[in-house]
Amino acid sequence: MKVITKVAELRRALADVRNAEKRIGFVPTMGYLHDGHLALISASREHCDVTVVSIFVNPTQFGPNEDLSRYPRDFARDEALCGSAGVSIIFAPSAEEIYPAQFESFVEPGELAKPLCGAFRPGHFRGVATVVCKLFNMVQPDVAYFGQKDFQQCAVIRRMTVDLNLPIEIVTVPTVREPDGLAMSSRNRYLCPEERDRSLAISRGLFAAAHEFASGERDAATLIALARRHLERVDRLQYLELVDPGTLRIADSPLRYPAVLCVAAYVGSTRLIDNVVLSWSPS
């Protein structure tokens, strides 16, 4: 496994891979890897010859009062996990390598970036789209892998690749959860034991709505109200919305296949997001 910090070196290493006509898979991360990231790596290794993992805490996707300075970082741990998982290349650039002096060109996403997280984190998806576009240009993968937990991010990136004619397949991998249902996230480490227990209200609310949907309930207000009852244990519910997975607009009620129930909530000072897809196979 190679650890590369410079774009020029990365391009040289991957030129040899392309010349050998090998398929390149890419997993962009901000580090502090967990089993969710390892599932993305596993998916890449299953379908690609070479897997590149980027580790870069992207400053442009954090707001002024967010957790950039305290976002968890442990490169030695990440390197060991990548080595055990069979990663071919770790790309771990500095902020100066990604955003050199006089940098001023950004990717401005459209309507998909406005609802849900976009309504509460202005500029977030601008930063996400910009860094992912830059990483795509640096790595030039055949396939890139993202987790379903970040459903809106996946939608924004998929739209960007289409709009900018990037020849990259975007694969979404199902959310990986702790045994008790909590969606895996690097930010879970912020939670004290009492907050960790209350954070289960998020997945339990989503699962309760999904169970009711599977039992035949199609009224959006009823499903949202059921999830909201569980979410009374969080400190602040930022949003709980049923949306169309293609447009991220509020889904029509009664629900039509499919819809996504999305939530963002604070437990203590930690902001957590999660979602569940509500769908069925037409008979």
Curated annotation (Swiss-Prot):
Sequence positions that bind ATP: 30-37, 147-150, 176, 184-187
The UniProt record lists the keyword Ligase: yes
Cellular component, GO, one term: cytosol
Catalytic residue list: H37
Keywords recorded for this protein, A-Z: ATP-binding, Cytoplasm, Ligase, Nucleotide-binding, Pantothenate biosynthesis
EC number, UniProt record: 6.3.2.1
Subcellular location(s) of the protein: Cytoplasm
Main location: cytoplasm
Keyword RNA-binding found: no
Residues annotated for (R)-pantoate binding in this entry: Q61, Q153
Catalytic activity: (R)-pantoate + beta-alanine + ATP = (R)-pantothenate + AMP + diphosphate + H(+)
NCBIfam families: panC (TIGR00018)
Functional note: Catalyzes the condensation of pantoate with beta-alanine in an ATP-dependent reaction via a pantoyl-adenylate intermediate.
Similarity comment: family membership: Belongs to the pantothenate synthetase family.
Protein name: Pantothenate synthetase 1
Organism of derivation: Bradyrhizobium diazoefficiens (strain JCM 10833 / BCRC 13528 / IAM 13628 / NBRC 14792 / USDA 110)
